Amino acid sequence: MSSARRPSKLLSEKQSDKLAQIIQNFFLKAAHVIFHFRVAFPSVVLQPDDSYGAMGDTFSQSKYNNRWFNLDLGNYEIPRTELSLWRNKDILSLPPLVLETFLDLRGLSSNQTLMLDDVIVKTSKKSEIVLERWLIEFDLSTFDNEVMEFPSIYKKIIILFRSLYLLAGLLPSYRLRDKLVKSKSKNSAIHVSCRILDGSKPITSKGRIGLSKKLLSEEEHTSSKKLQPVLTPIGALRVSVSYRTNCNFQVSDTEEALSSQFMLDHLPSVRTNYDSDGNSLTSPMDYLQNRVSSASIHWSDQSPRRRSSTRSVQLFKVGSINSSSSPPPGATQSNQSVSSFSTSKPIPVTLNKTNSSASLVPILRQNKDSLPKSIGSMVQNQMQETGHQVSSNSRRFSSSFGSRFRTVSSRNNSLDGQLVVANQPFSTPSNNPILHNFRSRNKSPSVSSTELGPSSSIYMDDDLDSFMKMLDSKPDLRFPSNSPSVYEDPLANFKTFQKSNDFLALEQQQHGSPTSNQIMIHSQSQTSQSQVFKRTVFSDRSRRGSVSSNYSPSSQALRPGASAPMVTPSVTYGKFHASSGSPSNSSLAQYLRHNSSPPASATAVATVHNSLRRLTSSSQRTNTNSTNSSTRPVNPELLKLKSFNEDVFESDDDEHDEHSPRSTDTKSRNTGPSSGHAEDDEDDLLFAMSDMTLAKNNQEF
C-alpha cells in the first residue's frame, strides 16, 4: 500500500493546491452524508450539556447545493463552528473526525420507561445512549507515490462516497431514526441526534451509556465496518464505523411495563427455560436456538456412524462465508472444536469491558489479531495460532477485480466487511519525499472550496489564485511627473496638420455651428457664369460683415489637390440675425482673402461685376416680352432682392478706386435719372425671375 521507492516527479504548486482541496472536502462531505441520514428535518433543538454539543435542527440553509464528489444532498449544511477544525487547519495536521450518533433521553419523564426488545433499560442518571461512532481520518503512514493523476483519485473518492451513502442507510440507527420520524407521536420523548468530536482527544462516557456497555445479555452487541481506503501521494483517506447491532428502542408507561412484567412472572403456564448448561434463556430467539441445537446433538448421538458428516445448522448463520464451507482435510479435532461449522453454540467473543468507553481511535488502530471484530475474524485468528492455513479458502471467494494494492494482501469476506491485510509493509511518513515537498509548501487553505457556486469542483480557484500571484509578482506602477513633454510631439503634429488643412477645419466649424431653417436647393444651371455670380456674392457679403437679406448662399468644402476651388452650385435659404453674419459666407471670405492679395482681389471683383452686367442686359433682351405679358402679382421677396442688389453693388463700388474708369462709369449710370432707373428695373426683374426659378426648384427638391 505504500511505495518506498523515490517517485519520478514531485507535486507542483498547482497540484498541491488541488490535493489539499480534495482532502479538505473529503472530511466535510463525509460529515454531511452521515448527518443527512441521522438528523431528521425538522428536528428538535437540543440543549447541549457542559461536555458535548448536540446537533438537532442546527442545520443552516445555504444558497447553493454542495455537489462535491457527484453527490447532491440538498442545500442543508453543517454550521461552520462545528467543522472549524477541519476548515482552516493545515492539511497535514488535520485531526481525525469522529461523528457520534446517540439516542437522546432528556425528554423522558418520570412515568416513562425505555425498553429494548421488551426489556427495561435502566436509564437512571443517564441522558444519552451512544448508538454508533464514525471515524474519518487521513493516514499519513499509508500512501502511493505512483498515483499522481488527481482525476483518478477524485473518481475513487466518488466510489467511496457511494459506498458510504449506502452503508449509512443500512445501519440499525437509521432504521430507529426512520421509525421515530414516522411515528404518530409528534412530541416523542426520544430522538436520534449527532455530534462532531475531535478524534485526537479521549472520549469519555460520563453521564451517558457508552458504546461498549451492554444493554442485554447478548454476547456481542457491537460490530464495525471499514470502507476501502483511497490512496494519495501523501496519505490514505479512511472511513470506518462501530455501531450497536440492536437499536429496537421504544418508550412505554412505567405502570404498563411493570404490570405486564408482573403478569408474566405469575402466570402458571410460563416457566423459565434453561439450556443444557443451566443458563437461563431470556429471549425467544435464545430458546429457539437451544431447541435446534439440542435436536441436532440428539440426532448425532443416535447415529454414531454418520457423526463425522453430521453438523449442526443454526437458525441464523453468524460468521464469515468461510464458516459455511467444508472443513479442510488436514484439520484436527481441536481445530474442529473451535471452528464455527463443528459447534452448535455461539463462539464467545472477548471484549474490553470498562465502565467508561475508551477513545475510538486507539481501539480501531489496534492490531487486528488482538481485538477481533467479528466471529469470522476470531475464528481466523484461532486457526492461525494452531497452524491452520485458511488463505486458500479465503481466496476462493475473493473479488473478481483482483487486488487493488501493490503489496500481497488477502480480503476477508466476513459479515462485518473489514479489510484485513496480511504481510503489509508500512513505511513511515519520513520516507515519503512527496510528503516533505508538500509540507514545505505549508498548505493551509483559509477558505474552503465548498463555499463556491453550484458547479463547485477542484478547478474552481485556479483563476483567482493565478490572478493574486500575478498581482504579487508585478511591481508597483510608477506614473511620470506632470511635465507636458509627453504631449509635445502629438501637439506639434496636430498644428502642422491644422495648417495644411485650414480650410477643412473651417468647414468642420461651419457644420458644427447650428443654423435655423436651412434648406439646400441644387440649381440645375452648371454654367461658369452662375459660379462666378455666387463667388461674387460670397465675397461681397464677407466684406460687409453683416447680412441684410434672407438669402445666404453656402459653400461646400473644396477638394484638396484641385487647381482651383470649385463651389457646388447650391443656394442656402435661411434666416440670420443682422448682428451675426453667415458662417458659410464668412468662412469663404476668409478663404478668398487668404489665397489672394488685396489688389488682385479688387481687380477680380471688378471683372466679375462687368460680366454680371453683360449677363443681365442679355437676359433682359430675351425675356422682355414674357415679363411684359406677365400679369402675376409682384413677389414680396422682390423688395428684398432689390435692397440686396443695391447694397451689394454700392458696397462694391465704395471699395473700388474712385479714379477707375469702370467705377466712374458705374457712378455716372447710377447718378443719371433715366438710365439709372432703367438699369435698376432690369436688375430687379432678373432677380425676381431667379427667385421664382429657385422657388420652383425648391418645391421639386
From Swiss-Prot:
Recorded superkingdom: Eukaryota
Compositionally biased residues, Polar residues: 521-533, 545-557
Biased composition (Low complexity): 332-343, 596-632
Regions of compositional bias (Basic and acidic residues) in chain numbering: 657-668
Stretches for region Disordered: 319-343, 521-563, 577-701
Cellular component annotations (GO), alphabetically ordered: Atg1/ULK1 kinase complex; cytosol; phagophore assembly site
Disulphides: none
Principal place of residence: cytoplasm
Subcellular location: Cytoplasm; Preautophagosomal structure
GO biological process, one term: protein transport
Biased composition (Acidic residues): 647-656
Keywords: Autophagy, Cytoplasm, Protein transport, Transport
A Pfam family recorded for this sequence: ATG13
Classification via InterPro entries: ATG13, Atg13_N, HORMA_dom_sf
Subunit and interaction comment: Interacts with ATG1 to form the ATG1-ATG13 kinase complex.
Function according to Swiss-Prot or TrEMBL: Activates the ATG1 kinase in a nutritional condition dependent manner through the TOR pathway, leading to autophagy. Also involved in cytoplasm to vacuole transport (Cvt) and more specifically in Cvt vesicle formation. Seems to play a role in the switching machinery regulating the conversion between the Cvt pathway and autophagy. Finally, ATG13 is also required for glycogen storage during stationary phase.
Similarity comment text for this entry: Belongs to the ATG13 family. Fungi subfamily.
Protein name in the entry: Autophagy-related protein 13
